[in-house]
Amino acid sequence: MRCKVQLYLCGKVFDEIVEARDYQDAKRTALARNPTAKVIGVTAVFG
């Protein structure tokens, strides 16, 4: 499924769209792309 992961880094909040199996996988993928960021939230994206 496609997930939107909200990340926080250096005072900014930004979204990372990832293809993942579940929410934990989405978090891992987003953190692999942005290792120093903090995950704020994960939501499924449809459409």
Labelled PLM ranges:
Residues M1-F14:
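Short aromatic-glycine-(Arg/Gly/Cys) micro-motifs in beta-strand/loop hairpins
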